[in-house]
Design a protein with these regions (language model features):
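Conserved functional hotspot residues or short segments at active or partner-binding sites
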Residues: 19
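Divalent-metal-activated hydrolytic enzyme cores
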Residues: 1-15, 26-127
Length: 127
C-alpha cells in the first residue's frame, strides 16, 4: 500500500494523499471484539486484519472509552486513521522526501456513513 502512494506521488506528481476511514467500521469493531474476547480458531485472514489494527486501538481499551462501545469504536476509527497517516509520513524514505522537498501532503479524514460528510480532522488540504 505504501508503494502505491510512493508510485503516485513520485511518478505522477500527486501532492495530496488522503487516508480515508469511515464511521461504524466493521474491521475496527471486529478487532476490538477480538481483543476483548479472543476466538481460539480465528481465520488467518481475520487474524491479519486484527494484527494490523491492534496497535492503534488496543491502548483505548485501558481508558474509560472501553465502557461505551459506540464511543470506543468512534475513537478507534480515528486512532487507526492517524496510525495509517503516521505510517505513510514516517515509514517511507521516498514519501518523507516528497513531503519535505516537494510539498506532498498526507492527511487523515473520516467519512460519515450517515451524513456523507468527510471530516478532514487531521489537517485540511489547502487550495
Amino acid at each position: 500500500q505504501v508503494g502505491s502512494v510512493e508510485f503516485a506521488a513520485g511518478r505522477f506528481g500527486t501532492r495530496l494523499a488522503v487516508v480515508l476511514g469511515h464511521t461504524q467500521c466493521g474491521a475496527i469493531a471486529a478487532t476490538l471484539e477480538e481483543l476483548r474476547q479472543p476466538t481460539p480458531h480465528q481465520s488467518p485472514n481475520l487474524h491479519s486484519i486484527v494484527d494490523r489494527i491492534r496497535p492503534s486501538v488496543e491502548p483505548l481499551l485501558a481508558t474509560p472509552l472501553a465502557q461505551d462501545a459506540d464511543a470506543l469504536v468512534a475513537h478507534a476509527v480515528r486512532a487507526n486513521i492517524r496510525a495509517a497517516v503516521d505510517h505513510l509520513r514516517h515509514g517511507s524514505a521516498v514519501l518523507e522526501r516528497l513531503v519535505a522537498e516537494e510539498g506532498l501532503l498526507i492527511v487523515g479524514a473520516e467519512y460519515c456513513l450517515e451524513t456523507g460528510v468527510v471530516d478532514f480532522f487531521d489537517g485540511v488540504p489547502e487550495a
